[in-house]
């Protein structure tokens, strides 16, 4: 099945040419003044989103930041052509074929300590009711302060500890804020739908070791 899939979707092979140009600089974009962090499992090497939380008196500004490779990728660029032909990264148990070359992924992944181009959605919410008051989108550079990992938080983050931000992490307050806002948005969706969203679904995670396909 793997050979058949590869023959259909990667007729020229899964690798990349060795002479592809490097990404352009995104230094002309304004730099966001937020403390941004990502949340992924420890096996994630392509970090493509991050969050930020700012206390603004009676409001809280939540930032959702998405990596923006297109900012440094001109239309018709050799890597643009490759990305359009692949359309996405392919994930399967034990297999991964990326949409972009490794050098580009490394250059554009939202790794901590770096400043990278992102598309940001900011939502101002009421600090008490957690209602969304306004939203704004920006194209900007973002400095990633930290890459948090699910598997290192699972043992200390529960519904009880996150509700009160009572766990050992410098991001306890921001994570608690995100949790409360997410619960408020969930309640709003359920009210609009007239029924609760499905609950109790198990999120499976598989970690495979070895090089054999």
Q: Locations of the language-model features?
A:
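Boundary/activation segment at the start of structured domains
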Residues: 1-10
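Electropositive polyanion-binding surfaces
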Residues: 16-213
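Short, flexible coil/linker elements and helix-boundary hinge sites characteristic
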Residues: 10-11, 27
């Amino acid at each position: 099945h793997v050979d058949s899939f590869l023959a259909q979707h990667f007729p020229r092979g899964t690798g990349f040419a060795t002479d592809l140009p490097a990404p352009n600089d995104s230094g002309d974009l304004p730099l966001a003044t937020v403390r941004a962090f990502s949340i992924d499992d420890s096996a994630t090497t392509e970090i493509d989103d991050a969050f930020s939380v700012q206390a603004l008196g009676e409001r809280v500004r939540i930032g959702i930041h998405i990596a923006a490779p297109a900012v440094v990728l001109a239309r018709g660029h050799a890597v643009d052509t490759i990305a359009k032909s692949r359309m996405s990264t392919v994930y399967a148990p034990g297999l991964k074929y990326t949409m972009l070359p490794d050098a580009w992924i490394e250059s554009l992944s939202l790794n901590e300590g770096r400043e990278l181009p992102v598309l940001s959605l900011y939502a101002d919410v009421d600090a008490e009711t957690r209602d969304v008051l306004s939203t704004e989108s920006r194209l900007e550079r973002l400095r990633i302060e930290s890459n948090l990992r699910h598997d290192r938080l699972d043992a200390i983050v529960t519904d009880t500890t996150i509700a009160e931000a009572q766990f050992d992490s410098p991001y306890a307050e921001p994570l608690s804020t995100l949790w409360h806002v997410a619960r408020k948005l969930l309640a709003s969706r359920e009210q609009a739908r007239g029924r609760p969203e499905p609950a109790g679904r198990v999120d499976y995670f598989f970690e495979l070791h070895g090089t054999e396909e």
